[in-house]
Amino acid sequence: ITSLGAREEVNQATHRWGGIVFHDVINQKFAHKAIEKGADGLILVAAGAGGHAGVISPFAFVAETRRWFDGPIALSGAIANGRAIRAARLLGADFAYIGSAFIATKEANAVERYKEMITTSGAEDIVYSNLFTGVHGNYLKPSIAASGMDPDNLPQSDASKMSFGTDDSGERVRPKAWKEIWGSGQGIGSLDEVVPAAELIARFKKEYDEAVDPPL
């Protein structure tokens, strides 16, 4: 899985040992570029995805991509229950790409406060900002507030530079993304507690099956 720049040499090296490459993309420009440079599949990071994310509706994103690409597609963006997984498949994606829901599992190595924050927050607790890395992403408002910043009044970062909380000299200039500012998608309103991953997957399967064949 690659992101933030498709690289031919990485794709070629992966193919040499029999691997396949999926590349994160947020729009058609990057999707075309990824395939041109040798990626095998695409991860469509749609509106509502956690961490670095785009703003395109999953309905539009999958439909437009399927007009020219018949390879494997994973769809990302606010997928946190089995019904959403089924919806992704109906849209034309081959896989649902899920992140935030698995942060709130017992096996995840995230700190407990992060897990708890995911299970007590909802879509309105997510803020979309490029301040923390130079690339727009979705973050938990409570984690921003806990770092002493106003999540509703964040300045814009220089979009031409990637930054992870330090200046050119390495000096810390703001709280660091991922370590103190926690990424999350908008689908977390479906999550109420930290559970074992197996329990989460079993719930996904039950919800998916019910969406395919609703109980009478």
Predicted segments — roles?
Residues 58-74, 80-216:
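Conserved active-site-proximal phosphate/metal-binding subdomains
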Residues 1-74, 82-100:
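Alpha/beta enzyme core
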